[in-house]
Design a protein with these regions (language model features):
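Hydrophobic core segments of transmembrane alpha-helices in multi-pass, intramembrane catalytic enzymes
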Residues: 95-99, 178, 245-253
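Hydrophobic alpha-helical transmembrane segments
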Residues: 57, 89-90, 128-133, 173-177, ...
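Functionally important transmembrane alpha-helices
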Residues: 222-289
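N-terminal, membrane-interfacial amphipathic/helix-forming hydrophobic leader that caps
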Residues: 1-116, 125-126, 278-289
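Membrane-interface helix/loop boundary segments of multi-pass membrane proteins
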Residues: 125, 186-227, 255-262
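Hydrophobic alpha-helical transmembrane segments of integral membrane proteins
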Residues: 51-61, 133-145, 209-242
Protein backbone atom coordinates (compact mmCIF):
# COMPACT_ATOMS: atom_id res chain seq x y z
CA UNK A 1 0.00 0.00 0.00
CA UNK A 2 1.34 3.41 -0.94
CA UNK A 3 1.50 6.38 1.41
CA UNK A 4 -1.26 8.05 -0.56
CA UNK A 5 -3.56 5.05 -0.17
CA UNK A 6 -2.83 4.89 3.56
CA UNK A 7 -3.66 8.57 3.99
CA UNK A 8 -6.89 8.18 2.05
CA UNK A 9 -7.90 5.12 4.07
CA UNK A 10 -7.22 6.95 7.35
CA UNK A 11 -9.16 9.97 6.14
CA UNK A 12 -12.08 7.80 5.09
CA UNK A 13 -12.07 6.05 8.46
CA UNK A 14 -11.94 9.38 10.30
CA UNK A 15 -14.80 10.88 8.29
CA UNK A 16 -16.85 7.70 8.71
CA UNK A 17 -16.26 7.64 12.47
CA UNK A 18 -17.32 11.28 12.83
CA UNK A 19 -20.41 10.71 10.67
CA UNK A 20 -21.49 7.65 12.67
CA UNK A 21 -20.87 9.46 15.97
CA UNK A 22 -22.99 12.41 14.88
CA UNK A 23 -25.76 10.11 13.71
CA UNK A 24 -25.80 8.16 16.98
CA UNK A 25 -25.84 11.43 18.93
CA UNK A 26 -28.84 12.66 16.94
CA UNK A 27 -30.71 9.37 17.46
CA UNK A 28 -30.12 9.60 21.21
CA UNK A 29 -31.31 13.22 21.20
CA UNK A 30 -34.47 12.24 19.31
CA UNK A 31 -35.18 9.39 21.75
CA UNK A 32 -34.66 11.78 24.65
CA UNK A 33 -37.18 14.23 23.18
CA UNK A 34 -39.72 11.48 22.53
CA UNK A 35 -39.40 10.08 26.06
CA UNK A 36 -40.04 13.57 27.42
CA UNK A 37 -43.11 13.94 25.22
CA UNK A 38 -41.49 16.69 23.14
CA UNK A 39 -41.72 17.16 19.37
CA UNK A 40 -38.71 15.96 17.41
CA UNK A 41 -39.07 19.08 15.27
CA UNK A 42 -40.72 22.07 16.90
CA UNK A 43 -44.00 22.58 15.09
CA UNK A 44 -44.95 25.95 13.60
CA UNK A 45 -48.63 26.22 12.71
CA UNK A 46 -49.40 26.92 9.07
CA UNK A 47 -52.49 27.04 6.90
CA UNK A 48 -53.63 24.18 4.66
CA UNK A 49 -52.82 24.73 0.99
CA UNK A 50 -55.39 26.06 -1.46
CA UNK A 51 -54.46 24.17 -4.63
CA UNK A 52 -56.16 21.13 -6.10
CA UNK A 53 -55.03 17.78 -7.46
CA UNK A 54 -55.31 19.22 -10.96
CA UNK A 55 -52.89 21.99 -9.99
CA UNK A 56 -50.45 19.35 -8.72
CA UNK A 57 -50.63 17.53 -12.06
CA UNK A 58 -50.00 20.80 -13.90
CA UNK A 59 -46.93 21.42 -11.72
CA UNK A 60 -45.49 18.01 -12.64
CA UNK A 61 -46.18 18.63 -16.32
CA UNK A 62 -44.45 22.02 -16.16
CA UNK A 63 -41.39 20.58 -14.43
CA UNK A 64 -41.04 17.50 -16.63
CA UNK A 65 -42.10 19.16 -19.88
CA UNK A 66 -39.82 22.17 -19.59
CA UNK A 67 -36.79 20.07 -18.64
CA UNK A 68 -37.26 17.68 -21.55
CA UNK A 69 -38.13 20.53 -23.88
CA UNK A 70 -35.04 22.48 -22.86
CA UNK A 71 -32.71 19.58 -23.64
CA UNK A 72 -34.42 18.86 -26.97
CA UNK A 73 -34.31 22.53 -27.94
CA UNK A 74 -30.62 22.90 -27.14
CA UNK A 75 -29.75 19.70 -29.02
CA UNK A 76 -31.54 21.04 -32.08
CA UNK A 77 -29.16 24.01 -32.17
CA UNK A 78 -25.85 22.22 -31.58
CA UNK A 79 -24.07 20.14 -34.16
CA UNK A 80 -23.38 16.42 -33.85
CA UNK A 81 -19.68 17.14 -33.34
CA UNK A 82 -20.33 18.75 -29.96
CA UNK A 83 -20.31 16.40 -26.97
CA UNK A 84 -23.90 16.27 -25.80
CA UNK A 85 -23.47 15.61 -22.06
CA UNK A 86 -22.16 19.09 -21.04
CA UNK A 87 -24.74 20.68 -23.33
CA UNK A 88 -27.51 18.55 -21.84
CA UNK A 89 -26.38 19.46 -18.33
CA UNK A 90 -26.36 23.18 -19.10
CA UNK A 91 -29.77 22.89 -20.75
CA UNK A 92 -31.12 20.95 -17.78
CA UNK A 93 -29.95 23.61 -15.32
CA UNK A 94 -31.47 26.46 -17.33
CA UNK A 95 -34.74 24.66 -18.04
CA UNK A 96 -35.12 23.57 -14.40
CA UNK A 97 -34.69 27.16 -13.22
CA UNK A 98 -37.28 28.30 -15.77
CA UNK A 99 -39.63 25.49 -14.71
CA UNK A 100 -39.37 26.51 -11.05
CA UNK A 101 -40.12 30.14 -11.89
CA UNK A 102 -43.08 29.16 -14.10
CA UNK A 103 -44.44 26.78 -11.46
CA UNK A 104 -44.27 29.44 -8.76
CA UNK A 105 -45.92 31.92 -11.11
CA UNK A 106 -48.69 29.44 -11.90
CA UNK A 107 -49.52 28.87 -8.24
CA UNK A 108 -49.38 32.58 -7.40
CA UNK A 109 -51.83 33.15 -10.25
CA UNK A 110 -54.04 30.43 -8.74
CA UNK A 111 -54.23 32.33 -5.44
CA UNK A 112 -51.39 30.77 -3.46
CA UNK A 113 -48.86 32.89 -1.60
CA UNK A 114 -45.09 32.51 -1.32
CA UNK A 115 -45.55 31.56 2.32
CA UNK A 116 -48.09 28.88 1.38
CA UNK A 117 -45.57 27.54 -1.14
CA UNK A 118 -43.06 27.22 1.70
CA UNK A 119 -40.86 30.00 0.32
CA UNK A 120 -40.38 31.92 3.55
CA UNK A 121 -37.11 32.91 5.22
CA UNK A 122 -38.80 34.24 8.35
CA UNK A 123 -37.07 31.68 10.59
CA UNK A 124 -34.03 30.98 8.43
CA UNK A 125 -31.57 30.60 11.33
CA UNK A 126 -33.76 28.01 13.02
CA UNK A 127 -34.28 26.22 9.71
CA UNK A 128 -30.54 26.22 9.01
CA UNK A 129 -29.83 24.52 12.34
CA UNK A 130 -32.53 21.97 11.55
CA UNK A 131 -30.79 21.21 8.27
CA UNK A 132 -27.43 20.74 10.03
CA UNK A 133 -29.02 18.42 12.58
CA UNK A 134 -30.77 16.52 9.79
CA UNK A 135 -27.52 16.03 7.89
CA UNK A 136 -25.83 14.71 11.02
CA UNK A 137 -28.70 12.27 11.45
CA UNK A 138 -28.99 10.84 7.93
CA UNK A 139 -25.62 11.01 6.19
CA UNK A 140 -24.01 7.94 7.81
CA UNK A 141 -26.97 5.48 7.71
CA UNK A 142 -28.16 6.50 4.25
CA UNK A 143 -24.72 6.33 2.64
CA UNK A 144 -24.08 3.01 4.37
CA UNK A 145 -27.39 1.65 3.07
CA UNK A 146 -26.61 2.98 -0.41
CA UNK A 147 -23.21 1.26 -0.30
CA UNK A 148 -24.74 -2.07 0.73
CA UNK A 149 -27.41 -1.86 -1.98
CA UNK A 150 -24.78 -0.91 -4.55
CA UNK A 151 -23.07 -4.28 -4.01
CA UNK A 152 -26.30 -5.98 -5.16
CA UNK A 153 -27.62 -3.48 -7.71
CA UNK A 154 -24.82 -1.20 -9.00
CA UNK A 155 -25.63 2.49 -8.85
CA UNK A 156 -25.83 4.20 -12.21
CA UNK A 157 -26.38 7.86 -12.99
CA UNK A 158 -25.31 9.44 -16.31
CA UNK A 159 -24.13 12.64 -14.62
CA UNK A 160 -22.00 10.74 -12.09
CA UNK A 161 -20.60 8.55 -14.87
CA UNK A 162 -19.72 11.69 -16.80
CA UNK A 163 -18.07 13.23 -13.74
CA UNK A 164 -15.96 10.09 -13.31
CA UNK A 165 -14.84 10.29 -16.93
CA UNK A 166 -14.03 14.02 -16.99
CA UNK A 167 -11.76 15.78 -14.50
CA UNK A 168 -12.81 19.20 -15.76
CA UNK A 169 -13.33 22.19 -13.45
CA UNK A 170 -16.15 23.65 -15.54
CA UNK A 171 -18.06 20.37 -15.68
CA UNK A 172 -17.54 19.84 -11.95
CA UNK A 173 -18.85 23.34 -11.21
CA UNK A 174 -21.93 22.70 -13.35
CA UNK A 175 -22.63 19.42 -11.58
CA UNK A 176 -22.24 21.06 -8.17
CA UNK A 177 -24.56 23.90 -9.21
CA UNK A 178 -27.14 21.41 -10.43
CA UNK A 179 -26.95 18.88 -7.58
CA UNK A 180 -26.44 21.26 -4.66
CA UNK A 181 -28.59 24.25 -5.63
CA UNK A 182 -30.95 23.84 -8.59
CA UNK A 183 -32.23 20.28 -8.14
CA UNK A 184 -32.91 20.57 -4.37
CA UNK A 185 -34.98 23.72 -4.90
CA UNK A 186 -37.00 22.15 -7.72
CA UNK A 187 -37.56 18.77 -6.06
CA UNK A 188 -38.41 20.15 -2.63
CA UNK A 189 -40.89 22.60 -4.11
CA UNK A 190 -42.53 19.90 -6.23
CA UNK A 191 -42.54 16.88 -3.91
CA UNK A 192 -42.41 18.32 -0.41
CA UNK A 193 -44.67 21.34 -0.73
CA UNK A 194 -46.87 21.10 -3.81
CA UNK A 195 -47.56 17.34 -3.68
CA UNK A 196 -47.17 16.66 0.04
CA UNK A 197 -48.89 19.91 1.02
CA UNK A 198 -51.93 18.96 -1.06
CA UNK A 199 -51.96 15.41 0.36
CA UNK A 200 -51.74 16.77 3.92
CA UNK A 201 -54.65 19.12 3.29
CA UNK A 202 -56.72 16.27 1.85
CA UNK A 203 -55.84 14.03 4.79
CA UNK A 204 -56.83 16.75 7.27
CA UNK A 205 -60.15 17.28 5.50
CA UNK A 206 -60.95 13.56 5.47
CA UNK A 207 -60.17 13.20 9.18
CA UNK A 208 -62.30 16.20 10.12
CA UNK A 209 -59.33 18.27 11.28
CA UNK A 210 -60.35 21.94 11.28
CA UNK A 211 -57.34 23.67 12.82
CA UNK A 212 -54.06 24.75 11.27
CA UNK A 213 -51.44 22.22 10.24
CA UNK A 214 -49.64 20.16 11.34
CA UNK A 215 -52.17 17.81 12.88
CA UNK A 216 -51.07 17.28 16.47
CA UNK A 217 -51.06 13.47 16.60
CA UNK A 218 -47.91 11.61 15.55
CA UNK A 219 -50.16 9.07 13.84
CA UNK A 220 -51.59 11.73 11.54
CA UNK A 221 -49.81 13.12 8.52
CA UNK A 222 -47.48 10.18 7.94
CA UNK A 223 -49.59 8.83 5.08
CA UNK A 224 -49.07 12.02 3.10
CA UNK A 225 -45.37 12.07 3.88
CA UNK A 226 -44.97 8.41 2.86
CA UNK A 227 -46.76 8.84 -0.48
CA UNK A 228 -44.81 11.99 -1.40
CA UNK A 229 -41.53 10.35 -0.32
CA UNK A 230 -42.23 7.23 -2.38
CA UNK A 231 -42.96 9.40 -5.43
CA UNK A 232 -39.69 11.24 -4.76
CA UNK A 233 -37.79 7.96 -4.54
CA UNK A 234 -39.40 6.46 -7.64
CA UNK A 235 -38.50 9.62 -9.58
CA UNK A 236 -34.93 8.30 -9.28
CA UNK A 237 -35.85 4.78 -10.41
CA UNK A 238 -33.32 3.45 -12.89
CA UNK A 239 -30.34 4.65 -10.85
CA UNK A 240 -29.69 1.23 -9.36
CA UNK A 241 -31.34 0.81 -5.96
CA UNK A 242 -30.87 4.49 -5.08
CA UNK A 243 -34.63 4.99 -4.89
CA UNK A 244 -34.74 3.00 -1.62
CA UNK A 245 -32.47 5.24 0.52
CA UNK A 246 -33.85 8.29 -1.27
CA UNK A 247 -37.38 7.32 -0.23
CA UNK A 248 -36.18 7.16 3.39
CA UNK A 249 -34.40 10.48 2.91
CA UNK A 250 -37.67 11.89 1.60
CA UNK A 251 -39.40 10.81 4.82
CA UNK A 252 -36.96 12.89 6.86
CA UNK A 253 -37.35 15.88 4.56
CA UNK A 254 -41.12 15.46 4.49
CA UNK A 255 -41.43 15.31 8.26
CA UNK A 256 -39.45 18.53 8.63
CA UNK A 257 -41.60 20.37 6.08
CA UNK A 258 -44.84 19.00 7.52
CA UNK A 259 -43.98 20.49 10.90
CA UNK A 260 -43.16 23.98 9.65
CA UNK A 261 -44.72 24.46 6.23
CA UNK A 262 -41.37 25.91 5.12
CA UNK A 263 -38.93 24.54 2.56
CA UNK A 264 -35.69 26.28 3.55
CA UNK A 265 -34.44 23.58 5.94
CA UNK A 266 -35.35 20.80 3.48
CA UNK A 267 -33.61 22.57 0.59
CA UNK A 268 -30.48 23.10 2.70
CA UNK A 269 -30.47 19.49 3.91
CA UNK A 270 -31.10 18.13 0.41
CA UNK A 271 -28.33 20.29 -1.06
CA UNK A 272 -25.88 19.40 1.72
CA UNK A 273 -26.54 15.68 1.29
CA UNK A 274 -26.01 15.94 -2.46
CA UNK A 275 -22.82 17.92 -1.81
CA UNK A 276 -21.48 15.13 0.40
CA UNK A 277 -22.26 12.62 -2.35
CA UNK A 278 -20.46 14.71 -4.99
CA UNK A 279 -17.42 15.17 -2.73
CA UNK A 280 -17.24 11.41 -2.14
CA UNK A 281 -17.40 10.84 -5.90
CA UNK A 282 -14.57 13.35 -6.47
CA UNK A 283 -12.44 11.72 -3.77
CA UNK A 284 -12.99 8.32 -5.38
CA UNK A 285 -11.96 9.78 -8.73
CA UNK A 286 -8.75 11.19 -7.24
CA UNK A 287 -7.99 7.87 -5.57
CA UNK A 288 -8.55 5.98 -8.83
CA UNK A 289 -6.29 8.35 -10.74
Amino acid sequence: MSATEGTFDFGTLLVGTVAVSLSVSMVLLILKRLLRGQNVVAADSHSPVSWTGTDVCVAFMIMIGMQLGGVILIRSFVGPSIETRPVDLAASICSTVCAVVCTIGFFLKRGATLSMLGLSLLHWRQDAWRAIAGLALVVAPLLTLAGVLDSFVPYHHPIIDFLKAHQDATVTAMIVLSAVVVVPIAEELLFRRILQGWLETREAQRSGWEGPLPMTSYSKGWGSIAVASLCFGLAHYGQGAAWIPLTLFGMVLGWSVSQTGRLFSAILLHGAFNCVSVVICLLQNNQAS
